[in-house]
């Protein structure tokens, strides 16, 4: 007889921390993919973006491969500026939202 989802959960409960880590990793990958798309739309290579942003090509690669969370704000600002955009930082606290930078 086939197991139901409820049966499977009873045998092997969901590890909420692992699920949350996976969600965060997937969110970073989606953001990185979008940045790669934006760069490609500008017909720029990673080397060109690095030169325009005055950062290493390896850092551009790292950002575009999902390592956005550990990037410094100034590095992200340079990267986005090299693509012709502006980086905004938004703060959300409860019902209040404002742009920090």
UniProtKB/Swiss-Prot annotation:
Keywords: DNA-binding, Toxin-antitoxin system. Induction: Induced in persister cells in response to D-cycloserine. GO terms for molecular function: DNA binding. SMART domains: HTH_XRE. Residues 35-90 form the HTH cro/C1-type domain. Residues 46-65 bind DNA. The keyword DNA-binding applies. Putative antitoxin component of a type II toxin-antitoxin (TA) system. Its cognate toxin would be HigB2. This is Putative antitoxin HigA2. It comes from Mycobacterium tuberculosis (strain ATCC 25618 / H37Rv). The gene is higA2.
């Amino acid at each position: 007889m086939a197991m139901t989802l409820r049966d499977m959960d009873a045998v092997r409960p969901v590890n909420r921390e692992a699920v949350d880590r996976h969600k965060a990793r997937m969110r970073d990958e989606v953001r990185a993919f979008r940045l790669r798309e934006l760069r490609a739309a500008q017909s720029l290579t990673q080397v060109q973006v690095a030169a325009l942003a005055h950062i290493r090509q390896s850092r551009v690669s790292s950002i575009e491969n999902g390592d956005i969370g550990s990037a410094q704000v100034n590095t992200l600002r340079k990267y986005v500026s090299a693509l012709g955009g502006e980086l905004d930082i938004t703060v959300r606290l409860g019902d209040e939202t404002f742009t920090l930078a």
